[in-house]
Amino acid sequence: MKTPVLKKKIIKIFQKYDLSKDHALISANALINAELVGAYGHGLSRLKMYCDRISKKIINPKPKIKTKKISQSISHIDANNSIGFVAADLGIKTAIKHAQKNGIGMVAVKNSGHYGLSGYYAEQAVKKNLIAMIYTNAPPAVAPHGALKSLFGTNPVCFGTPTGSKIPFILDTSISVINRGKIRVAARNNQKIPEGVALDKFGKPTVDAKKALEGVQLPIAGFRGSGLAWMVDILSGVLTGGNHAGRVKDPFDDFSGPQNIGHLFITFKANLFQKNYNQRIKDNIKTIKKLPKIKGVKEIMYPGQNKFNRYKQNLKKEISISDIIKKDLEALINN
């Protein structure tokens, strides 16, 4: 399906579920971006879930979002259980304004929901020649190191910086071996997941995606990944006023109340300390790319390069939609 046609359909669906035109557009743009960069677990596979949560009055389609200015560079946003895309859009835009005016910006958000890809928001800051660091927590999926029960979310860590070229450096990675969205997509399509990704509910390694969803995901690098997940839970949950310590509800399975996810957006001018930052980052990347390569490796890529190239390629083509997603779209449009 052509991107403009698909975007119109998504906007129409969100407006049907009482989102304003502006909020529907913000949400559609984020979903389309996820599809174009190949992050399908954060794309159209979640559209029905958002609509279900709106119809059950868990996501507030008409939120009264409040922004409290703590200082010239710091704000705290209460998203009033809005769809996560809208809360995150306001969060990053506010952080960008603070940084452009004062050199640095920090925005905490509470009472939000799943907002898609952190890198999508980091890229908005990078385009303004800002460095961005973004944290958000998620429903329990990963067991803390030494524990038998999942408590941490896949809690992504995101860092973005200008590179002096058109392709930004965007590191957007969950602290689990793979993100939960990929496992959900695999489960829905009856596909297997790689080994070493998850344990079933009995604590045994599994490649069955459905059993993985019933069990726990494994963190990257053992106790180090567990520590990173804990850090993100503190920064995005404890600090912001959002849910934390396993209290974020699963958006697909738990309709007992709002998620109250927290986000933290930190932005600052790339040339804050070194006026020639862009030249220095170019030198940094050039030096690393010149290193001897392993056999079969054509180019040493920096984080974000592959997704940028994939986005450009996919933008020229139609977005491929599975039969399951097509049924979701038809049902949501005709409901």
Predicted features along the sequence, with ranges:
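Catalytic-core signal marking the mid-to-C-terminal active-site face
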Residues: 239, 244-335
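Generic N-terminal amphipathic, Lys/Arg-enriched alpha-helix
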Residues: 1-17, 264-266, 309-313
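Small-residue-enriched flexible segments
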Residues: 180-241, 258
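Phosphate/diphosphate-binding glycine-rich loops and adjacent basic-rich segments that engage nucleotide
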Residues: 142-210
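Acidic, glycine/proline-rich low-complexity segments that act as flexible tails and inter-domain linkers
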Residues: 1, 12-27, 32, 40-58, ...
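A generic, well-ordered mixed alpha/beta core segment in the N-terminal half of proteins
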Residues: 75-164
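Active-site cofactor/substrate anionic-group-binding motifs, chiefly glycine-
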Residues: 43-99
